[in-house]
Amino acid sequence: MSRKKRYINNGKTIKEMLNLVVKKFPGEPAFKRKEQGKIRKISFFELLTEVRNLGTALYEDGLGKERVAIIGENSYPWFQVFLSIVCGGGVAVPLDKGFTATELRSCLERSGAKAIFCDKKHEPLVQEALALKEEGKEALDIKVYKMTGEEERLSEMKKIGEQAILNGSTAFYDAQMEADDMAVILFTSGTTSMSKAVMLSHRNIMSNITDMQHYERFYVSDVNMAFLPLHHSFGLVGVLVFMASAACSVFCDGLKYISKNLAEYGVTVFVGVPLLVENMYKKIWQKIRKDGMEGKVNFGLSLTKIPGFRSVWMRRKVFSKIIEGMGGHLRLIICGAAPLLKETAKGLNDFGIETIQGYGLTETSPVIAAECPEDLAAGSVGRPMPSMQVVIEDKDENGIGEIVAKGPNVMLGYLNQPEETAAVIQD
């Protein structure tokens, strides 16, 4: 398939988005994952089938339109669960795997979750949180489902859902939702003593995805490495935007396996935070110096200033060995959450790996502004997304002030905190 093939998804809800992709690209890989040492491709059709089976099982368990929490490492089972919740009309509550038992219990109580899915590693934390007893509070009546490890429930649940569908159940298939219905509750890591529960609708998320699809260049042939935590809006929407674009996502095996995973999965897009991206760039130069190639690389960099050598294609040709060291296919790095060093952004772009920055927050689902490959400026976060209006209020003599943003990606509000919501949403 041509590298340049793009797909703009017009879905108004996450369920509609997934159905549209499956209808047009049923056989394209939605995910790749390792199974028994081999890489397996999961097509969009297979993904939807598994999501429908699991979502139907949730209806069979009385959880079809409830709030359901998820905690665990980034994984394909994690995302299956997420999609089965939100595409069935429920609300997903992704939770930070770094929570203490007390923090986890608090978020479960505040969110109103009726069940929680956890992986094997975090089951002890979940059980500890549920066992906590606080004076004057009732015990939490929450169902616990294991996603991975011994006694994992997903395989059994998918069989239950499949049989229910064969028996005539259409509960999940028929589940209706409006664009303004809540889809996700995300807890901010926050600067206050208690994190806020941000309510995001299908419209919030899908409008941001559509903006990014029009503004950036995502291709059907792309392979996105999902490294950022899925309980963060940047990590979660970072996978959803590639799914909406009919591209593939993979999950990193861990920090020390990034280089290996980039190569074996054929990763073309990496979404990360500055510290990680800067470390990747430092390692490139460490290897250049170790191999005694500094002079040749500097000569190559001088060539890229000549008009005939400025194209991305030519830069990648000149620095093909560096590209090979980054897995051989990496073409785009998207960075957010904090400022990226100008030297790093410029350096990676000079090597032919387009590196862009964005700015946003959980409350805006999350992107407010971003660079695009046609409009790069090291040190900048680019321009506002197409559907956003952004102004700087109360500017000082240096032009620094408060960023005020308006658009369809602005949250529904903070859960059960009307005063806090009113303080930040004025229109």
What are these regions (language model features)?
Residues K4-K12, R153-M182:
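Flexible, low-complexity linker/hinge segments
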Residues M17-N19, C87-I160, F172:
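Structural core segment of the AMP-binding/adenylate-forming
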Residues P26-P29, A164-F187, M194, R217-V223:
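Conserved pre-ATP/AMP-binding loop-to-beta segment of ANL
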Residues A30-G62, E66-S75, F79-L83, T100-E109, ...:
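Conserved AMP-binding/adenylate-forming core of the ANL superfamily
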Residues K41-F45, A183-I209:
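Conserved AMP-binding A3 loop
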Residues A69-I71, W78, F82, V86-F117, ...:
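Short beta-strand->loop structural element characteristic of the AMP-binding/adenylate-forming
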Residues M206-V223, L230-F319, H329:
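Conserved AMP-binding/adenylation subdomain of ANL enzymes
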Residues F270, M314-D427:
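Conserved AMP-binding/adenylate-forming
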